[in-house]
């Protein structure tokens, strides 16, 4: 009887490499970060588990809800879908980087004043998306606000208080310019 030899599948080498740590360099909230990460680790997990910045939330983990939004080079991205190595040499902003010290920024303050926060789980993603929108377009229409928040789901507020907070934030930011 012929002895069977073990043959590894072509994908097994890739699976072995998944356990290796890769060097990672990027800027997070204005500070340089250097670390070693698994190539399969998401940016969400890296930020929350390794850096202990828990403001960014993981809800659906499928890129459908927007609670995990971060800005990568100024563009909102679902950090649950971005692998940590993909932000090599890029700038990442989380909700922790939005506020100025211990004071909320204008958008955060307007969310508070307008009652646009209920359970709060979606709030970091909404505020992060709004930061990107208002940086690109300081005077958005209601339709542009809705389009800018298209990837964010809020199950509590019904969006009216969120839209009012964003309009007031845009107005307040316009007065400061």
Give the predicted meaning of each segment.
Residues 1-177:
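Signature of N-terminal electron-transfer/Fe-S-associated modules in redox systems
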């Amino acid at each position: 009887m012929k002895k069977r030899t073990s043959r590894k599948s072509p994908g097994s080498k890739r699976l072995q490499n998944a356990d290796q740590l890769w060097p990672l360099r990027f800027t997070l909230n204005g500070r340089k970060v250097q670390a070693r990460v698994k190539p399969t680790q998401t940016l969400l997990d890296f930020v929350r588990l390794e850096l202990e910045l828990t403001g960014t939330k993981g809800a659906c983990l499928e890129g459908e809800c927007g609670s995990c939004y971060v800005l990568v080079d100024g563009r909102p991205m679902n950090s649950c879908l971005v692998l940590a190595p993909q932000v090599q040499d890029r700038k990442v902003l989380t909700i922790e980087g939005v506020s100025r010290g211990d004071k909320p920024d204008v958008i955060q303050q307007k969310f508070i004043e307008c009652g646009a926060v209920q359970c709060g789980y979606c709030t970091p993603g909404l505020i992060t998306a709004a930061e990107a929108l208002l940086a690109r377009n300081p005077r958005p229409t209601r339709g542009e606000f809705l389009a800018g928040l298209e990837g964010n789901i809020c199950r509590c507020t019904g969006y009216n208080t969120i839209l009012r907070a964003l309009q007031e934030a845009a107005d307040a930011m316009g007065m400061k310019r």
